[in-house]
Regions:
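Conserved non-cysteine loop/helix-boundary elements of the Radical SAM core domain that shape
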Residues: 1-86, 90-109
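Auxiliary Fe-S-binding modules of radical SAM enzymes
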Residues: 101-227
């Protein structure tokens, strides 16, 4: 750490993947969460910017285990977080486990729901998630074998969160009219619409609403139900 500081390094990222020792052991990580805590303490002592990376869906991981990892990471108070859903890439240890039938990748829907829950927790803790999902690198795509990959993974997660916000507002109404209008910031319209208007279609089906209109506004920070 001293060497990094002396050479003007300002940001350090740790790919901790998980805080669960069983998960870390299953993927051959040599250090456990205690070691991670020690490293974070050393980084903080030298006033370096700290980023932590998580990988949901590793062997022996599940929803409760990963959300505990999220809670543990929040306790470490990093400056930012990246979340990389686990994918099976050719010529890796995980690929060998997959080939032997020892690892089953998560579905896209399952991963989206888990990452959504994690994003909500990080937002509550005021910790920015600066990246979700891998870049669409040609080399990676050539070697991608299986797993919950989507080129717009972050958009899908943010769109699910947006849908939940609309649903929550509608649920608070005493009487739900056949038509509703939401005011949304112009830069978030696509999030509230959902992919191919999936959010609007889903909400209409849930509540038996005939029409949902989105009214663009540039002077609002968040969603507002107006009718």
């Amino acid at each position: 750490i001293s060497f990094l500081k002396d050479n003007f390094v300002q940001v350090v990222e740790l790919g901790i993947q998980s805080t669960n020792n069983d998960v870390l052991s299953a993927v051959g990580r040599p250090c456990g969460f205690t070691t991670v805590r020690g490293a974070v303490k050393s980084i903080r002592k030298r006033n370096l910017t700290l980023g932590l990376q998580l990988m949901p869906g590793l062997p022996k991981d599940d929803e409760s285990t990963f959300l505990q990892s999220v809670k543990d990471v929040i306790g470490l108070r990093p400056d930012f977080v990246r979340i990389y859903p686990t994918l099976v890439i050719r010529n890796t240890t995980l690929f060998k486990m997959y080939s032997r039938g020892e690892y089953l990748p998560w579905s896209l829907d399952r991963m989206l729901q888990l990452v959504k829950a994690a994003m909500i927790e990080f937002e509550k803790a005021d910790i920015p998630v600066i990246r979700v999902g891998l870049h669409s690198d040609p080399s990676m795509l050539e070697n991608l074998v299986d797993g919950p990959y989507h080129p717009s993974f972050r958009y899908l997660v943010d769109s699910l969160i947006a849908r939940d916000k609309m649903v929550s507002m509608i649920e608070r109404l005493k009487n739900i009219p056949p038509e509703l209008t939401f005011k949304v910031p112009s830069n978030k319209v696509s999030l509230y619409l959902g992919h191919k208007k999936s959010n609007i279609d889903k909400i209409k089906k849930i509540f038996g609403i005939n029409n949902i209109f989105l009214q663009q506004t540039s002077n609002q920070e968040d969603l507002k139900l107006v009718a």
